[in-house]
Amino acid sequence: MSLLLGVTSCHWFNPDDEVVYDRTVLAYIAAENSLSYGAFHEQDIDEMLQAAGDIPANSRLLIYLDDTSNPRILSIEQQSGRRPTSRVVHEYSEEQNSGDVETLRTVMEWVCDHYPSSSYGLIFWSHGDAWLPAKAVPQRSICIDNGRNNYSNSGSKMDIADVADVLDGFPCLEFILFDACFMQAVEVAYELRHVTRHVIASPAEIPNPGAPYERMVKPFFSVPFDGAEVVEQYYRMYNDSVISVFGYGSDRYGVSLSVIDCSRLDALADATAEMVTKYVSRDEATDLKGIQRYYPLSSKSRPEFYDMNGYMRRLIKDEADYVRWKSVFDLAVPYARSTAWWYSNDAYTQRVDLDNYGGVSCYVPQDRSIYDGLNEKFRTTSWYVAAGWQEVGW
């Protein structure tokens, strides 16, 4: 189900640079947090090993692994007639903070120096909280590092804007996959639009088992890159199988996903700004009751993550205007899938409004007397200006 998507403003290697591999995919696994306690990183590495035979001969799948041992870089390999292995190709002599963008920078430098490639993919594996600043509550945006503590989630974390600044110094990525909660937010993708062609993620929480890598390694290396197939394989694992939260009972995991074509995000910002400036009142917040929201169950009142299509459908009063906006949205989000429910906070499932599901979340500025702190944080995003919110005084 290949999608021929547009071209971003990404930059590339100088043509004189040596290119050895067709594509190198790096999984940046920041596991010094509660996910390590559950050994979920080990399960996912095992899944990658199962799919080692799907890695093309002239491509590489690397893992930067920071768990409770010293950080190291692994190469997933399968030699003819032998079992797949995760070979250590680089080991760090001391502890690193994987929730620091400088660590991301040094890892990317090492990978690009030692595996020069025509294209790259990047997987962020950890906890995530979309566009919220790293100093906001809860205290993370992407990749928590608690040192050698694997019981909690209170350690260092990276702001998405800082991640974008670091990645801007490297060859344009073919894709970024967030195997982390809440990261398919339009504010996140817009921040990353110059450093990657595609963003694949969930607007909601990700179930503990995460991505089914044994299904997804093959499309990671597709040419042209097939982001829709990555989404489809991820979705199918949860839709086609009954995976019970406890191993018994009716509670079962679900997942919501989409792929964003970053070359279309400026057009989406323009179309959204047109509608925001036409339909948003400077003095009265939009009625948000009944619009699909994504949240941890323990924080059900959090208003950060509304389904973008659901919100815009409510906001735009003229059907012709909505159809026009939706046509731009569909180019920016060419493929989205969701089970009938989405997973939340270990043991609960929430129904998905499939009729209005867009697969991408957005923040909507709200009552200043209650949410002005969140509104203020939203004003620090690039999307706030691009999508017209500054112009209407929110």
What is each of the regions a protein language model found here?
Residues 1-2:
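Sec-dependent signal peptide recognition
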Residues 6-9:
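C-terminal motif of bacterial Sec signal peptides marking the signal peptidase cleavage site
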Residues 11-116, 384:
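N-terminal extension/subdomain marker
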Residues 18, 113, 137-394:
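Terminal, contiguous helix-loop blocks that mediate binding/assembly
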Residues 24-29, 60-65, 121-124, 174-178, ...:
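Structural recognition of the beta-strand scaffold that forms the well-ordered cores
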Residues 31-32, 67, 126-128, 366-368:
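Residue-level signal for short, function-critical loop segments
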Residues 32-34, 126-132, 181-185:
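Gly/Ser/Thr-rich loops at beta-strand to alpha-helix junctions
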Residues 66-89, 119, 124-150:
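Surface-exposed loop and adjacent secondary-structure segments within mature catalytic domains
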